């Protein structure tokens, strides 16, 4: 606020000075003293105003001009003016004190000097003060401000064990120093977005009870040259004054990217900042008691000099949680929500493979919002299922009008997926089938894995292929080949990619054998070539296409045979989907056993609740979900 006030004062003084200069230069027309005397003698002057040695003259025609009286006594002038009956006026001399004269004379200079001193003092300050570009933007949090502990971090037990030594060192450094051991100078936490890297860093500071400096990698480099390196120096100077302490640099790949990489060349500001960081972390001057923790989801782009031992001695992988980790994370977030007794965290964890900690937190929040919309006192399993479906596939599009024929076609399509997925060997169990449009999909078939899959066998892949093609085959068997819709476009895309990877990467072709036919050339910005080298002949490429086609045809034929043998179940499942729109695991088992179908949970709830569930604006799609396919209706 003070800086803005000073700025406006400076602008006002400049405008006043300009106005006065303009005013003084734009007064009445000036002429010589001889003309004035001539006009007086000819009787052309009606009034004369004397202001020191300046005379303002008014002529008989009303025009005015000014002239300056020379420093000579003209005793005859007054007599001539009076004889011609000219109105004579005078201005008294302004009597100013000595101090007033000095103030008026020196005020502009003193004012400018004061403004200059003000800005110079601001430059010596830190933080966000004026022109303090070289000061660190790191925010320091004291131990009283950090309330996060290891109890708030779940799903990454291995990572917590890795960083546990840091906490012990910060609590009792002599324990390690007496034995001659050295604590790691830096820890690089690597993992996908949302896995809890920042949360884990805050938990380390909360457990160790030490100051915590936090900054983003993008906060170093500015528009001015040298600012990034200056901020790095200032950050480490502040950290040394508060040692022992932690420095957390989030998204370090913004400043620690590999030097000399990319399509361009030459030196840039980012490299200068990185060089200064390398020196500060492991240079001639030590930084004992200062531990640097950095987080990134792109470790492959970091400079090797930054990740070597002595700077970041230890890399801690904070990966996506497994089913047990997801259960623990869900329980942590459910503490803040009033959850009903029917909510099973393990069931939710099984149905959310590939979810990060942030995704699970969003799942719990969405379920709470669903319950609040219908004025429930607790969050039930129904709200969690609706929240999971919304995150996986987007909100329900109940306003989308589908004809009876479109509903029937979609029901046959999804029933084909469900029947083949239920009967092929080693496939994930069918969890839910719906024909309610979600996002870009007209219908969805959900499969619930029994556990996390670290690797997948050839039999599982081929079962997946049969299931993917089953939706298209169901339409073919019911309506004929000429009436197949474009709903299977995404199924075909996914199946083709799986079949091609089986041949070119995973060695599941007897003819071509376990040979890699594709190579990852890396990214262009890492200094690698833009051109992709061809590692196979045209004959080999033709053989690959033949093997891919053989795998697809084999599983296509198997899916057709399964559907032909179970046409009665296909028709019954279609009828159930048209009636209920969504069927769950219990109804699917009844249909597969050819038993009467009971209504699914939530069937018959008030329309107001259904509308409240449907009125959702978030479209947070997640491609790594347990959804088997999405029937894209856009051609």
From Swiss-Prot:
Keyword Protease among record annotations: yes
InterPro entries (UniProt xref): AAA+_ATPase, AAA_lid_3, ATPase_AAA_core, ATPase_AAA_CS, FtsH, P-loop_NTPase, Pept_M41_FtsH_extracell, Peptidase_M41
Gene Ontology molecular function terms on file: ATP binding; ATP hydrolysis activity; ATP-dependent peptidase activity; metalloendopeptidase activity; zinc ion binding
Cytoplasmic topological intervals: 1-4, 119-635
TM annotation in the entry: 5-25, 98-118
Pfam families: AAA, AAA_lid_3, FtsH_ext, Peptidase_M41
Cofactor(s) the protein needs: Zn(2+)
Ranges where the record places region Disordered: 593-635
Gene3D superfamilies referenced in this protein's UniProt entry, alphabetically: 1.10.8.60, 3.30.720.210, P-loop containing nucleotide triphosphate hydrolases, Peptidase M41
Compartmental location: Cell inner membrane
GO biological process: protein catabolic process; proteolysis
GO terms under cellular component: plasma membrane
Assembly information from the UniProt record: Homohexamer.
Similarity comment: family membership: In the central section; belongs to the AAA ATPase family. In the C-terminal section; belongs to the peptidase M41 family.
Protein name per Swiss-Prot or TrEMBL: ATP-dependent zinc metalloprotease FtsH
The species this protein was found in: Haemophilus influenzae (strain ATCC 51907 / DSM 11121 / KW20 / Rd)
Gene this protein is translated from: ftsH
